[in-house]
Amino acid sequence: MPMATAPQDEYRALELLSRTPYGRVAVSMRALPFVTVARHIVVDGRVVLRLHGGFGYAQACDGSVVAYGADNLADREEGDESVWTVQFVGMARRYVPGPADLEAFGRAPVAADSTPFVPEYLCIEPQFITMHHLEGVPARRPAHSA
């Protein structure tokens, strides 16, 4: 699998990440893999994640190598037939966001699985970044109309 190792590719991958607010973080927890949704921002070449603390995922990720991925599959505008994906791995560490970070994240969700959303933050320095583009991908249309 080709790795995006050229600095311009890494810059482009982080620029694409900054265009979409959510992705998925994956880590091993009790020897089993899990994946969960996370809100992300890109800050000085690092990716900062906001997760719901009630799930315990930030604690499980802290100090571990995680994989993170995001794409524009759900965020494409009408007529946009370009799909991109960005994935990377890196060490996740708990993070205390500053005022600028909190502003960039915007309002947190109100609830997660019917419980009050309690934000926890992780910071990852991306390594082994991969980026893929697909062209000519038509927008998905519902199979059935309501």
What are the roles of these predicted feature ranges?
Residues 60-67:
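Short coil-to-beta transition motif at edge beta-strands of beta-rich domains
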Residues 18-20, 32-33, 85, 115-117:
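Short solvent-exposed loop/turn micro-motifs enriched in small/polar/acidic residues
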